[in-house]
Design a protein with these regions (language model features):
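Intrinsically disordered, low-complexity terminal tails/loops enriched in metal-binding residues
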Residues: 2-7, 14-124
């Protein structure tokens, strides 16, 4: 009887964790980049010919970027570089960076409400 009770508890807990994972939706890239989630938002980092673009959405809807500030820190082996993120339409852009496979990127953002958000990526 005890084993049956423990099995029921384990099954219930696994079902709860599955629903929590589904609540945030899928992390599929919309712009061909690498996706990460933080602060209930989805972030997509995309390598561009001039640097990088960062798209932000909230459950599939683009986030208003007016007043958002931040920077990208790029770690490629022993090399470290940084660039300021600026609003460019529906995305934030950082120029002068080179993103290659295996590069680690940290986005440090500040929202208009002065909330700090840190997002980490590994370029694939």
């Amino acid at each position: 009887m005890k084993n049956l009770l423990w099995a029921a508890v384990a099954l219930s807990l696994s079902a709860l964790s599955f629903n929590v994972a589904l609540a945030h939706g899928e992390n599929k890239p919309k712009h061909g980049g690498v996706v990460s989630a933080a602060s209930d938002l989805h972030f997509e980092l995309v390598a561009t010919s001039t640097g990088a673009a960062l798209y932000i959405d909230d459950h599939g809807k683009p986030v208003a970027l007016t007043g958002m500030t931040g920077k990208l820190t790029v770690l490629n082996g022993t090399e470290k570089s940084e660039a300021v993120l600026t609003v460019a339409g529906d995305k934030l852009e950082a120029k002068g960076l080179k993103l290659v496979k295996g590069t680690k990127v940290v986005a440090a953002l500040t929202t208009p409400a002065k909330k700090a958000i840190t997002v980490r990526f590994t370029v694939k």
